[in-house]
Amino acid sequence: MARFGTVLFQILAPLQLTLVAFLAALKAASAVAQEKDRGTLILLLMTRMSNTELVLGKLLASLLDVAVMLWVALPIFALVVLFGGVSLEAVMRVFAVTFATMLVAGSWGSTIALRNEKTFQTLAWTAMGIVLWAALSEAIALGLVAGQVPSAAIVGLAISPASAILAAARPSLETTGSFAILGNGVAWYLLATLSVAIGLNLIAILRIRVWNPARESRAAPAADVSPRAGEPVEAAPASAEEHITAAAKSGRTVWHNPILWREVMTRAYGRKMILIRLAYLLIFALTLAGLYATISSGDAFAHRSARDASLPAAARPLAPFFLISLVIVNALAVTSITTERDSKAIDLLLVTDLSPKEFLFGKLGGVCWVTKEMILLPIVLCCVLWASGGVTLENLVYLIGSLFVMDLFAAMLGIHCGMHYANSRTAIGVSLGTVFFLFLGVATCIVMMISFAGSFESQ
């Protein structure tokens, strides 16, 4: 029973950390993005509220639900102590690491939301930032960046949430000595994350009135060209008429489905989409490097015993990349509807001659086109794994088919939640939360089945 409690605790602790980190970041980001979409953030800036009250107030209010969920989970983790193999000190360490990660993830999401104008850009940058943080810090902890040196492992433990949560959940953690607190890697992680959270909030406090309103919203006041009382009304100059005529002739041909045309042919999601694609390509390169290292070392083809069974080595770099791809597809789908509603544009679309089929399939096709990299690049990684002999051709077909189904499900789920929930924050939370819970829930179930492969009773 002690081994069962230890393994169960080491599975639940990273799961809770992952959920809390992503939920905190996305809730904080969506809370600020909703204020921007509705135009109420500018009204808040015009009040007597200070920058500190505005930034910290929005952050703490958005993290309240996540903190309550974390508090409710504490008694459940305490029950694991009854199985043996886990101490209350380990539970406290795990919750301290999780709470610090929640603060830094929420601060990152809030700062990014205050910086960006479009909701999709905010959610994409938030999710990719969390993944990059986890991937790069874990690479440093494993010695893949700075080499196998002792200092790299110490620095990696201080900045890597995965290494910190595993160190906190480890039963044997030395705490002796006069400098035990400073020498503890978990303590260094807490110090580093709290410092980063304070730094992010300071940047947001100092720059909130510089970033907001954005340049796109700062329209120059129009000149007063109305005639005064008693003055004759003169005709418009010929140059103005020629300009109007030229502007009228320079229109573009709209497709039969105007919704699809707008999604594909215009910059409907802002001018910074190229930066999001570049960041995603960076994550793809890191994932490809991790997969190549796994294949080169032979870990991707290693067969372990039932007692030492764990998640396959090739799945470790691929699973986070697949998750972030689904999250971006889902985020674009739900924000494509919520942005239309918050800007009151959907009311105008409802009075046109557009059919529901044109609107739905136009949005769905636009989401698939804009996120084509997030749909195709995971398939490329699967093909690389097949070419190296990691999977058979039959399994490759199943992988590609499953990815297409999951991408379509994520896109349709986002559109459904955006249309079903009137509140944008609720729609975004339900949509992204469903993707996270389904993906991580199934992955955790698989890990538990593999970890307890030697005991049917434990499974």
State each model region's role.
Residues 1-23, 30, 65, 69-72, ...:
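Transmembrane alpha-helical segments and their membrane-interface loop/helix boundaries
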Residues 31-63, 259-264, 268-269, 337-369:
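Helix-loop-helix units of permease transmembrane domains in multi-pass membrane transporters
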